Amino acid sequence: MLALIMAAIVGITSFVDPNDYAPDIEAVAGDNQLILDIQGDISWQFFPQLGISVKRIVFSNNVISAGSIDELVITAGLLNLLNTDFDQANLPIDSIKVVNGRARYIAPNLLPVQFDNIAISINNFSLDGGETDFSASAAVFGDLPLSIEATVALSHDGQKPNRVNATNLQLNVDQISINGHINADLENAQIVGKLSSPSINIRRQLKAIQLKLPIFSIPVMASATALTDVHFNSEFSINSKGYSNYTHQLFIDNQKFDVTVEADQTTGLMNTSVTSNQFRLHDYLPPQGSPSNNMQTGAIFAPLALPFVMWSGESQIELSVNEITMQTFSVRNLYSRLVGRANFIQLTSLNADLLGGQLNATAEFDLRDKQPSFTLQPQLNTIDLSQAFLALTGNPDVGGELSGGVAVSGIGDNLVTIQQSLLGIGQFSVINPIFSTFNVEQTVCQSAAMLSGSNSSGSFAAGTQLDTLEGNLNFADGQLIISGINTAIGNLKLRGRSTVQMIEQRYTLN
C-alpha cells in the first residue's frame, strides 16, 4: 500500500514544478509585511522524508533589515498526507529546517545586531496541542554562541494560534544558561512563566565579550570575586492589556535582592520594590587609591531607572537596603522612593543612617526641556565629623556634630554648565567642633606675645575646642559663598567668610 502511495506521489510531483509557485509565495509574504525573494530553486525532496527544499531565500521586514537563508526544508509524513482534511490547524507538515541563516536585527534606540550561522529545527510539528520539538542556534558578535531548546505545544482556533506552552525551555547565551517554562494565552494576551538560572560568572562572560568587542571595556572592581556568582529565580504573569506582576530573587555574590513589580495597563501605573539585607558596594567600585570612575558608580544604580525608561505611564520605585558597606564606612537603613515618568522624576524620600547621623533628601529631575534641570534639598543631622574625616581622609583630626541643609537648583547637560547655573541657599552648624592637631588659642596668644615683645605664658590643652560653629551657604554664578561664619574660643570671637570658585576650583577664606 505504501509503495503504491509513494508511486502515486512521485508520479504527481514529476508533473508539478514548485518553482512555478514562487511568485505566489512571495506575494502572500508581502501581504503579511514580509519582503521575500526566492533566488534559488524550489525542489521536491523524497528521502528521508517527502518534502520541499527552497534554496537561497532573502527577506526583510520592519525589524529585520536584511536576512537570508541558504536552505529551507519542509517535510510531511505520509500518514499526514493521507488525511485530506487540511486547514490552518491541520497542516500536513512534520518538520521544518533552516540551514545557515543570517539576519540583521534593528530596534529603536539600539545598535543593530547581526546574527549569523542561524540553524532552526522543528520536529513533530503540530497546531492541535501536540508536543513539538523546537531548537535553534546562532552566533552573534562574530562567534558568540546562542541556542534555545524547548518542547512547544501550539493550539489553533481554526484561524490563528490561540495558545503556546513551552516546557523544558533552555536558553544559552555563551556561558549563561536560563531554564524554565512559559505558557502564553494569545486570546487573552496573558503570559505566565517561571525562569531560573544556575550560577553565572558575569566577570568571565564580560571578558569573553571584550575579546569579541574590543571597544567594550570591563569595569575595574576592588574585589577579585565580584560578579563571579550570579543567579536568579523569576516568576511572572504578564497581561499586555491589564494587570501584570513579576517576582524576582536575584543573588549577587551571596547577596539576595528581592524585586517585585506590579504594572497595570488600565491605570498606567507601575510599582517596583527592591529590598536587600546587605550590599557590599565597595566590592564593585575601583580599588581604593585608583582613579575614581563616576560612570561605573552610576552604572551600578542604572537598573533603577529601567522602569522609567521602559514604562510609558507613571512609575514608582522603592529601594530599601539594611546596610550598604563602603571601603571605610557603612550606610544603614537606606530607604528611597522615586515617582514619575521618563522625562520627569521626583525623589520624594531619601533616608539613611551614616557616620553617626542621618541623611534626608528630596529632589526633582526635569528632562522635558532641551536643557535638563533639577532641584535638590539634602539635610544632614548630627553627622560625627571624626567618623567622617576618618572615613574620607584616614585621619580623625576634626570632630564635632554637623547638621545642615541646602535647597539648590540647576540646569544644564554638563558639569561646567550645571556649576555655573547653581542657585540656592542653606545653613550649617557644628556642635562641639574640635581640631585635634593644633590649638588656635595658643597660636593666637603666642603671636600676640611675639608682636608685643613679651613671652607667652600659660598652659593650653591639646587641640582646639570651639564653641558652636555656624554659617550660611549661598550658590550663585559658579560660586559657593560661605558667609556668617561664627564661633568662639573662650573669650576670643571668630568670624569669617569663604568663597569657593567651583569651576576654577579656587578657595579663599577671609
Feature annotation, model-predicted:
Residues 51-63, 95-97, 102, 119, ...:
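Small-residue helix/turn framework positions
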Residues 288-307, 454-456:
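Intrinsically disordered, low-complexity segments enriched in small/polar residues
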Residues 6-96, 235:
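Terminal hydrophobic membrane-targeting helix
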Residues 256-258:
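Long, internal scaffold/assembly segments composed of regular secondary structure
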Residues 330-332:
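Extracytoplasmic assembly/pore-lining segments of large envelope/extracellular complexes
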Residues 78, 82-88, 298-307, 412:
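A short, compositionally biased domain-edge/stem linker segment
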